[in-house]
UniProtKB/Swiss-Prot annotation:
<keyword id="KW-0267">Excision nuclease</keyword>
<dbReference type="InterPro" id="IPR035901">
    <property type="entry name" value="GIY-YIG_endonuc_sf"/>
</dbReference>
<dbReference type="GO" id="GO:0005737">
    <property type="term" value="C:cytoplasm"/>
</dbReference>
<dbReference type="Pfam" id="PF02151">
    <property type="entry name" value="UVR"/>
</dbReference>
<dbReference type="InterPro" id="IPR004791">
    <property type="entry name" value="UvrC"/>
</dbReference>
<dbReference type="GO" id="GO:0003677">
    <property type="term" value="F:DNA binding"/>
</dbReference>
<dbReference type="GO" id="GO:0009380">
    <property type="term" value="C:excinuclease repair complex"/>
</dbReference>
<dbReference type="InterPro" id="IPR047296">
    <property type="entry name" value="GIY-YIG_UvrC_Cho"/>
</dbReference>
<dbReference type="InterPro" id="IPR000305">
    <property type="entry name" value="GIY-YIG_endonuc"/>
</dbReference>
<feature type="domain" description="GIY-YIG">
    <location>
        <begin position="12"/>
        <end position="87"/>
    </location>
</feature>
<keyword id="KW-0228">DNA excision</keyword>
<dbReference type="InterPro" id="IPR038476">
    <property type="entry name" value="UvrC_RNase_H_dom_sf"/>
</dbReference>
<dbReference type="GO" id="GO:0009381">
    <property type="term" value="F:excinuclease ABC activity"/>
</dbReference>
<dbReference type="GO" id="GO:0009432">
    <property type="term" value="P:SOS response"/>
</dbReference>
<keyword id="KW-0963">Cytoplasm</keyword>
<dbReference type="Pfam" id="PF14520">
    <property type="entry name" value="HHH_5"/>
</dbReference>
<dbReference type="InterPro" id="IPR010994">
    <property type="entry name" value="RuvA_2-like"/>
</dbReference>
Length: 551
């Protein structure tokens, strides 16, 4: 624990202070008056301040010229070191980005993490939209999505033969590949007219060459691209690239408009000032920056570090989009209140020991007694947390009750039990879960829903609720999510086993060819029905004939 004597020589000037324990960063803060701010920490009036001082063994102070410099330096250090007690924009961890790596021949990927190097575009709201966007753009420009060491690749993969990758592994023309990467950057920065013009040029070229197959391919890509953008709802007449920020009760909402299209609606809950939020949100962004930030919030900043104007004069469409942002904030708070009230109601109706702020749900899925899987889904404050979902392989168990007991032993010998466990099933499943918890010496509330009748089952009672009851709807949403996750994984295990037994028995089909075939055709049945000529282009005449013979 630090002694208050470390403050004797601290200046009263503005600056940044760093609490550390050895090499671990405990807390980083800024102050207009360093001595006054640090004295407040050492008064130990707040629990957080007490923990910071108790867990630190050193204090560093950096003096700067003014409060704005302190704000920027604080954001820089927090982004770099991610201290234990600093408030981060954690909601941002769940939003997806499109990343272009910094390799000599860059690859592209969808990721939720910004820990790697490279150029990031986003964040986007919806993972499905993000993946589809990258899939379409990858086919248009031919950039690679594989992460392989290109120097170890002997020949191009199937993507090259399908003309969806320029195959930088051939090392033929770096300028052409980097031009494709630059085109991709341009589109991801919001220049959607560029990609439309690019596709139309390709269509016209192939049409003139009487290559109608490729002309049709680019026509379909253009239609797919336009259809995907139209799913975003708001499309403006102009091609602005603007961020609209609404703020209320420590919740920030950012509407990202790029190329006149509303690409993202991003919520962040953080106990930060408006200026602190701006620095945390925009710090580290080297691309995908707006031309301006529009907000009703008063700010001491005329522009942030990247020279982005703030609070410029608003036109009618600016006001319209800010009104949309604030309406969404209202709905956010309304939904939050409803979830909180529903959790309280769940406690009362089910007779729980405490409000179930954390609910974990499980469902057992199998295929005729094989590929048995337990899915785990997590809801916190009534909101799903997909990043904490897990799947547990249980082998070939046909007994539903024993599967539940095995899952609980696997999960809760290593992890803390939640406020409430949901199991998909009735009295038998609930009792099996309770028995397993008793074996572990844990007293955990368990609830299930019997299929078809929608009868709610707890340790001591069984009852029905009206179809529109919020408690029933919440439990059903958890059940449906567990069911979806379990079935998707069990199905993938079945497919994996099936492909092993079929393709691996064919001479000449190794892991690489198998991967190529399944990526192209998705299933054994599709491979079986594929034209011989088409298969020959992918795996050669000899292997294509063998596929036809064996399948």
């Amino acid at each position: 624990m630090l002694d208050k004597s470390v403050l004797y020589n601290v200046s009263e000037k503005p600056g940044v202070y760093i609490f550390k324990n050895g090499s671990e960063y405990i807390y980083i803060g800024k102050a207009k008056n360093l001595k006054r701010r640090l004295n407040s920490h050492f008064s130990l009036k707040e629990e957080k301040s007490r923990l910071i001082v108790e867990e630190s063994n050193s204090l560093e102070v950096i003096i700067v010229k003014n409060e704005k410099e302190a704000l920027l330096l604080e954001a820089t250090l927090i982004f770099k070191h991610k201290p234990k007690y600093n408030i981060m924009l954690k909601e941002g961890e769940r939003y997806p980005y499109i990343r272009i790596s910094d390799d000599e021949y860059p690859y592209v990927e969808v990721t939720r993490s910004r820990k790697s190097s490279g150029i990031f575009f986003g964040p986007f709201t919806n993972i499905t939209f993000t993946r589809l966007l990258l899939e379409i753009l990858q086919k248009i420009f031919g950039v690679r999505t594989c992460k392989k060491d290109l120097s170890k690749i002997k020949k191009p993969c199937i993507e090259y033969h399908l003309k969806t990758c320029l195959a930088p592994c051939k090392f033929e023309n770096k300028n052409i590949y980097m031009s494709a990467i630059n085109n991709l950057k341009k589109v991801l920065s919001g220049d959607f007219e560029f990609v439309k013009d690019y596709i139309e040029q390709k269509m016209n070229y192939h049409s003139k060459m009487l290559d109608f197959e490729n002309a049709a391919k680019y026509r379909d890509l253009l239609l797919s691209f336009e259809k995907l953008l139209n799913t975003q709802g708001v499309i403006l007449n102009d091609k602005r690239c603007v961020d609209y920020i609404a703020y209320s009760k420590k919740v920030f909402l950012v509407l990202k408009v790029r190329g006149g299209v509303l690409l993202s609606k991003l919520f962040y809950e953080a106990n930060l000032s408006f200026e602190e939020f701006l620095y945390q949100f925009y710090y580290g962004m080297k691309s995908d920056l707006p031309t301006k930030i529009v907000t009703f919030e008063s700010s001491n900043l005329n522009k942030i570090e990247f020279d982005i104007p703030i609070n410029v004069s608003l036109d009618d469409s600016d006001r319209y989009l800010l009104e949309i942002a604030y309406e969404n904030l209202k709905e956010h708070f309304k939904a939050k209140r409803l979830r909180r009230d529903t959790l309280k109601k769940i406690k009362e109706i089910l007779g729980l020991k405490k409000i179930p702020y954390r609910i974990e749900g499980t469902d057992i899925s199998h295929r005729n007694g094989k590929f048995t899987v337990a899915s785990l889904v997590v809801f916190e404050n009534g909101v799903p947390k997909p990043e904490e979902y897990r799947r547990y392989k249980l082998g070939d168990i046909l007994d539903d009750f024993e599967s539940i007991r095995m899952f609980i032993r696997k999960r809760y010998t290593k992890h803390e039990a939640p406020d409430l466990i949901f199991v998909d099933g009735g009295r038998g499943q609930v009792n099996a879960a309770i028995e397993a918890f008793n074996e572990l010496g844990l007293d955990v509330d368990v609830v299930g829903i019997a299929k078809k009748e929608e009868i709610i089952v707890t340790k001591n009672k069984e009852f029905k609720l009206k179809e529109n009851d919020e408690v029933l709807r919440t439990l059903i949403s958890i059940r449906d999510e567990t069911h979806r996750v379990a079935n998707s994984f069990s199905g993938s295990l079945k497919l994996k086993n099936y492909t092993l037994s079929k393709l691996d028995d064919i001479p000449g089909i190794g892991p690489k060819r198998k991967k190529i075939l399944l990526k192209k055709y998705k299933s054994i049945e599709n491979i079986k029905n594929a034209p011989l000529e088409e298969l020959s282009k992918i795996v050669g005449n000899k292997i294509a004939l063998r596929l036809k013979e064996y399948l």
